[in-house]
């Protein structure tokens, strides 16, 4: 099971974090700071897997963002690397060509896509099409809620 997922920039700015195990805020901040230092200090040619505390850390850099997952000891690192890649593919499909600014200004969509893809640290749906369809339906529903309607339409009389 995945314990948490972090997205951070090369400058060490946290852009997204998702925790799948209850952890205090103080401990989270400490873990994020430590892990960012470890990952950012590594050379590009080094392996994307590392042992850290009692966890395995799998990370991948895409452009200026690091996607970093902490998994339990018995979990498969290659599957986790593929999950990171699938998440990036979903972000790319939704945003066009995703960049750090898309994550910054549309963080709620990035979280929503992650929640459609992963639930409780485990894969919920591996199909890109079904995840993107669910996101598209949610967008349509949100657009309907935000569109101005008359009083008669609100009452179902129009």
From Swiss-Prot:
Protein name: AP-1 complex subunit sigma-1A
Function: Subunit of clathrin-associated adaptor protein complex 1 that plays a role in protein sorting in the late-Golgi/trans-Golgi network (TGN) and/or endosomes. The AP complexes mediate both the recruitment of clathrin to membranes and the recognition of sorting signals within the cytosolic tails of transmembrane cargo molecules.
Cellular compartments annotated: Golgi apparatus; Cytoplasmic vesicle membrane; Membrane, Clathrin-coated pit
Subunit structure: Adaptor protein complex 1 (AP-1) is a heterotetramer composed of two large adaptins (gamma-type subunit AP1G1 and beta-type subunit AP1B1), a medium adaptin (mu-type subunit AP1M1 or AP1M2) and a small adaptin (sigma-type subunit AP1S1 or AP1S2 or AP1S3).
UniProt organism field: Homo sapiens (Human)
Connected disease: MEDNIK syndrome: A disorder characterized by erythematous skin lesions and hyperkeratosis, severe psychomotor retardation, peripheral neuropathy, sensorineural hearing loss, together with elevated very-long-chain fatty acids and severe congenital diarrhea.
Induction: Up-regulated in response to enterovirus 71 (EV71) infection.
Residues with PTM Phosphoserine: 147
Keyword vocabulary terms for this entry: Coated pit, Cytoplasmic vesicle, Deafness, Golgi apparatus, Ichthyosis, Intellectual disability, Membrane, Neuropathy, Phosphoprotein, Protein transport, Transport
GO cellular component, one term: trans-Golgi network membrane
Keyword Endoplasmic reticulum included in the entry's annotation: no
A Pfam family reported for this protein in Swiss-Prot or TrEMBL: Clat_adaptor_s
Membrane topology label: Peripheral membrane protein
Highest taxon in the source lineage: Eukaryota
InterPro entries in alphabetical order: AP1_sigma, AP_complex_ssu, AP_mu_sigma_su, Clathrin_sm-chain_CS, Longin-like_dom_sf
Annotated tissue distribution: Widely expressed.
Family listed: Belongs to the adaptor complexes small subunit family.
Swiss-Prot/TrEMBL GO biological process terms: basolateral protein secretion; intracellular protein transport; melanosome assembly; platelet dense granule organization; receptor-mediated endocytosis; response to virus; retrograde transport, endosome to Golgi; vesicle-mediated transport
Molecular function as annotated in GO: clathrin adaptor activity
KW Protein transport (keyword) present: yes
